[in-house]
UniProtKB/Swiss-Prot annotation:
This is Hainantoxin-III 9. It comes from Cyriopagopus hainanus (Chinese bird spider). One of its GO terms (molecular function) is sodium channel regulator activity. Monomer. Selective antagonist of neuronal tetrodotoxin (TTX)-sensitive voltage-gated sodium channels (IC(50)=1270 nM on Nav1.1/SCN1A, 270 nM on Nav1.2/SCN2A, 491 nM on Nav1.3/SCN3A and 232 nM on Nav1.7/SCN9A). This toxin suppress Nav1.7 current amplitude without significantly altering the activation, inactivation, and repriming kinetics. Short extreme depolarizations partially activate the toxin-bound channel, indicating voltage-dependent inhibition of this toxin. This toxin increases the deactivation of the Nav1.7 current after extreme depolarizations. The modification Leucine amide is found at residue 81.
């Protein structure tokens, strides 16, 4: 009983240390994850001439960034699946 309580407290202490040490890395994790999923930097839309995910577009015009296509149904840029 004492050993299991000690292991539980040691585990919680270790979890606290790991969370505290990785706190600064966790703040950038969602941005890195989205950048890798969509293969473009979706957070710098003002710097580029193309439109990113969810931006309104006109079907037929090549306004969307690479890896995106303008949806004729919804009229916004979405991920191009190659169909």
């Amino acid at each position: 009983m004492k050993a299991s309580m000690f292991l539980a407290l040691a585990g919680l202490a270790l979890l606290f240390v790991v969370c505290y040490a990785s706190e600064s890395e966790e703040k950038e994790f969602p941005i890195e994850l989205l950048s890798k999923i969509f293969a473009v930097d979706v957070f710098k839309g003002e710097e580029r001439g193309c439109k990113g995910f969810g931006d309104s577009c006109t079907p037929g015009k090549n306004e969307c960034c690479p890896n995106y296509a303008c949806s004729s149904k919804h009229k916004w840029c979405k991920v191009y699946l190659g169909k």
